[in-house]
Amino acid sequence: MNKYWENQLNKSVVYQKLKSNCVRNNQHEVLALVEKISTFAIERLKTVIKNMPEFTLHDDTHIYNMLTIIGKLIPQEKLRKLSTPDLFMLIISVLLHDIGMAPDEKYILAWKNQLSEAEYDETLIEEREKFARFRLTYTHQVEDIERLREEQEFSKAQLIEDYIITEYIRMTHSIRAREIIAKYWAGKIVYQDTDLTEDLATICFSHNESYTYLLQMENFRVCGQDEYLCIPFVAVVLR
């Protein structure tokens, strides 16, 4: 975890409360996990600016701003009463909820048809087909692309293609967040002996869904003796 982000994180009242709890209860592994997730999220989110420069706020500043807002949104007396799992999940869901805005490079190349046929495995073929169906819904833009290519205005045509890809990434990012969490963090989001990976993925997915999705969530996850994670609470705050 870089020094700048460490300083920013330490300013968050939510993190301060988590850190206080973990130090008091000798749960340093929880803080270490937050550090690992922070490094992963911040490094990965840098590619958002690379691929979609208009989304400049999906970075560590955006994460810090969200944690600051959450710290103001939750009254101090309520914050003091939150369980350690609640605090932990609030922080890591903020870190990872937009991770789907940063797809693996191979998917972007597949959507742009910039891979050789030999490079397309079953997953990439499926992704290319899903994007192709999505692209067809942008009727006017596709017509403009074809016209510009006929006029040999290739750079202008590519700008429109990039716009459609950006919209696809944005509209599917919560699904992708769940997939990325499953791929890179399966079995690693653990508090005490409780695996919270699936709960984290569900919470991150929920932030882009209708509020009615929250009604389908489990209410609590037992995380140890007299310790519980309130899943809908974290999901509501994240929204």
Predicted features and spans:
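C-terminal effector/catalytic modules and regulatory tails appended to multi-domain proteins
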Residues: M1-S38, Q225-I231, R239
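Short, hydrophobic transmembrane alpha-helix segments
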Residues: M52-P53, I74-K78
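Short, mixed-charge, low-aromatic patches
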Residues: K19-E29, L45-K50, A132-R135
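Active-site flanking loop/helix segments enriched in acidic
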Residues: F40-N65, I160-I164
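Alpha-helical repeat scaffolds in large eukaryotic proteins
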Residues: T68-G71, A182
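Divalent metal-dependent catalytic cores for phosphoryl transfer on phosphate-bearing substrates
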Residues: R80-R239
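Catalytic phosphate-handling regions of large nucleic-acid enzymes and associated NTPases
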Residues: N2, T47-K50, H58, M101, ...
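Phosphate/oxyanion-binding active-site loops and adjacent basic polyanion-contact surfaces
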Residues: F55-I69, I169-A177
